[in-house]
Amino acid sequence: MTTHRTAELSRTVTLSGTATLIAAALLTGCGGGSAAPEAPESNANPAASTDPAPPGSPTSVSSVSATDSGEAPSSETTQTTPTRPPDVARVVTAAGVSQYLECSGVGTPTILIVPGLDSSIDDWLPVLPALREQSRTCVYDRPGIGDSPAREGGGRVDSGLHAEELAALLTEAGESGPFLVVGHSYGGLVARAFINDQPSRVAGVVLAEGVTPFDDTNGSDWPEGGTVVDLPLSYQATGDGPALGTTPLVVLRASDPEGDHLGGPRYGQPQQVTAAWIAGQQAALSLSSNSIGVEATSGHVLQQDDPAAVIKSVAVVLAAVRTGTPLTCADDWQAVAATCTEP
């Protein structure tokens, strides 16, 4: 059960079961997809509404400062955010679908979290407070997941459609960006499609164990929220996109991919990651000339098993965006060539 409180955006959660987050196309030995979640009851989220939020006022924030919690080195530059709505915690209808959106905090660029397959906002609870301290942060549930009602009629979907619906959601909610896009697992494909379609709205990227368009050797479908995600079509929606130029990019991956566990070690569902997955992670670094790889000490669900790695990855991208300097490893990371590793 999840309780949303609009004023404080705090969430009380009982986590159970295993979230199926990794795309079947890049895994071996993968079982059937998790059951599609039921659409939430109309009274399940008292804070949710489709009423537009009133405009907010400009806010000044300073760039993040270095702390043990994983924030990037400080900058003297002070950023002023454009006029924005106040904190958001509601269902927004746009592009014919309704999706639950939470946005909180101040600062620019806005951190935009794109969850993995069958994954809800709840899976990001370990990192949300720290990210909101760094900058404005938005996270959402796709149709049929978490607090978002199911898509009418179900049907087949793909990363391109999900990216279009995400862009419409943000526009309808008054979140104009620019965005630091954080794509996890299948969310990496959605993030790439979003970046291709909305390049002017993207300031930085973190691909956290992101599925990449560099391999389509196993064209499987995967259920999510009463729909079927067409993975081959999802690859096509991202594979021919433009490079990121000098846009800061962190490619964050688990430290033990050959023995990775779906959902992280705590969930105990071992899945062997293929060589194509590893190669795709490496190839993703070529998307930007300002990129670094980060190896985390975790399983696939980094935000659950190694929150600090996610927080620090976002922090170094924020610092690069705000100061206009090349990406560097966090202070306590070890640099080996173009890869940063946790101690």
Label each PLM-derived region with a short phrase.
Residues 291, 295-343:
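Catalytic active-site module of serine/aspartate enzymes centered on a nucleophile-bearing elbow/loop
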Residues 265-293, 343:
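Conserved loop-alpha-helix segment in the C-terminal half of the alpha/beta-hydrolase fold
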Residues 31-34:
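Bacterial signal peptide processing site
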Residues 206-234:
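Flexible "cap/lid" loop of the alpha/beta hydrolase fold
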